[in-house]
Swiss-Prot record:
Organism of origin: Corynebacterium diphtheriae (strain ATCC 700971 / NCTC 13129 / Biotype gravis)
Protein name: UDP-N-acetylmuramate--L-alanine ligase
Name of a matching Pfam family: Mur_ligase_C
Subcellular location: Cytoplasm
Family per record: Belongs to the MurCDEF family.
Length: 477
């Protein structure tokens, strides 16, 4: 950490998933950290407990909130407007302003950098890789976009040589890293509000692969055509290790390294037999879904490449209890009119993610042999909703019943004439469009039956409804 003075850091939007993790590492390293956010939150409270000084609301005077002006100001440019008063104050005082990705890149210097990229599955795969390496005794540093359920944290300053982190492509931040091991889970057009074209989106992954360091390894999912094509493109320039199904491994024999030999879904989870290199292990996944098995393959491949023992990595994967908001179990109704109904919450906000989660929910429902799948979905961003309305409708129709909330605009302004009905009107299952957020739990209760699997889904405020729905269903216990 030589090029940036991190002795006194101020972070705008410090409570965000990515920012709070980096703040944790800075505090562990002895930096004096201050920050601001628009509201109180669990991450803000946790950082205060670690010693950070944090203000709610953005004001110019927040820069000196800890008693001195910062040596550097950190922000997420995608989330923070350029007229933010703290940004303006920093520039007026000639204080360097850097992106969160620049800071993370600085923190990863002198480590073996394990970067997890891809359109979907980054957080789950990164989390599995971390838990696996911990089980293998490697104590990696890490920064994750979600909170590990078991560890209760999203970042750690470890004693091992590996640093595992998500490489976010949404604003091309992944091009600020220097991976020794680069994992690409899948590639599918997204974030077109930033990239404008699919071609520009695909290119950012080519550029990411170009940044793999000499002697490094590119790990790709062979079941995903675009990730597999990336591996094929770079296999003569660096070590490429592919993972996936036996059929995919046969299609790409030159790079196949990790293969799912067998998978069996039961009420207690998913059992998979996985061959990594010349060795085979059995893994029991607590989190359902074929996509989660592929994520486990990515984590095992990265772990072995990082020098860890496969058996110990596999034990860590089998002990993996998930990440907050990734098919996160909120509770079961023990009795009454909705007995044995279960409520889950998931961050899925792209049609492919919705498909994967609902297929996983269906696998779980079929393993139980009873009940239905009910989804309460909140679209995220007007641009994404308009771009993928038909695909969302098809994906959501994998459930048995649905409640569709209005669009969570986040950083975008409303678009006249556009609401979630452009999705719900195309769906082929019973569906209710409910624009009143406070009425959603009641709508779900009207639909619910005993033994149902109910999933709240989306990247916005819908997560607040999981416990509200569970409480409503438990009123009849």
């Amino acid at each position: 950490m030589n090029s940036i003075d991190l002795s006194r850091v101020h972070m705008i939007g410090i409570g965000g998933a990515g920012m709070s993790g980096v703040a944790r590492i800075l505090l562990s390293c002895g930096s004096v950290v201050s920050g601001s956010d628009v509201k109180e939150s669990r991450p803000v409270a946790a950082l205060r407990a670690m010693g950070a000084t944090i203000a709610v609301g953005h004001k110019a005077e927040n820069l000196a909130i800890s008693g001195s002006m910062p040596t550097v100001v950190v922000t997420s440019f995608a989330a923070i407007p350029q007229d933010n008063p703290e940004l303006q104050e920093a520039r007026a005082n000639n204080i360097p302003v850097i992106r969160r990705s620049d800071l993370l890149g600085e923190l990863m210097e002198d480590h073996q950098q394990v970067l997890i990229a891809g359109t979907h599955g980054k957080t789950s795969t990164t989390s599995m890789a971390v838990v696996a390496l911990q089980a293998a005794g490697k104590d990696p540093s890490f920064a994750i976009g979600g909170q590990l359920n078991k560890a209760g944290t999203n970042a750690h300053d470890g004693t091992g040589k590996a640093f595992v982190a998500e490489a976010d492509e949404s604003d091309a931040s992944l091009l600020r890293y220097k991976p020794d091991i680069a994992v690409v889970t899948n590639i599918e057009p997204d974030h077109l509000d930033f990239f404008k074209t699919s071609e520009a989106y695909f290119k950012v992954f080519d550029d990411f692969a170009e940044r793999v360091q000499p002697g490094g390894t590119l790990v790709v999912c062979l079941d995903d055509p675009h990730a597999a094509a990336l591996g094929e493109k770079f296999k003569d320039r660096m070590t490429v290790r592919g993972y996936g199904s036996p059929a995919a491994a046969q299609q790409y024999p030159d790079v196949a390294f990790t293969v799912v030999e067998h998978m069996e879904v039961g009420p207690a989870g998913t059992r998979a037999r996985i061959t990594v290199g010349d060795d085979t292990v059995d893994v029991i996944m607590r989190i359902p879904g074929h996509h989660m098995v592929l994520n486990a393959c990515a984590a095992l491949t990265a772990g072995v490449t990082a020098g860890a023992e496969l058996e110990r990595l596999a034990a860590g994967i089998s002990d993996f209890s998930g990440v907050r908001r990734r098919f996160e179990f909120h509770g079961r109704v023990s009795g009454g009119a909705f007995h044995d109904a279960e409520v889950y919450d998931d961050y899925a906000h792209h049609p492919t993610e919705v498909t994967a989660v609902l297929k996983a929910a269906r696998q779980q429902q079929e393993a139980r042999g009873i009940g239905r799948v009910v989804v309460a979905f909140q679209p995220h961003l007007y641009s994404r909703t308009m771009e993928f309305a038909a695909e969302f409708a098809e994906a959501l129709s994998l459930a048995d019943h649905a409640v569709i909330l209005d669009i969570f605009g986040a950083r975008e302004q409303p678009v006249e004439g556009v609401d979630s009905r452009i999705i719900s009107d195309k769906m082929t299952i019973p569906v209710v469009f409910e624009p009143n957020f406070s009425a959603v739990a009641a709508q779900v209760k009207k639909i619910a039956q005993p033994n149902d699997i109910i999933v709240t889904m989306g990247a916005g405020s819908v997560t607040l409804l999981a416990d509200e729905i569970l409480t409503a269903l438990r009123e009849s216990e």
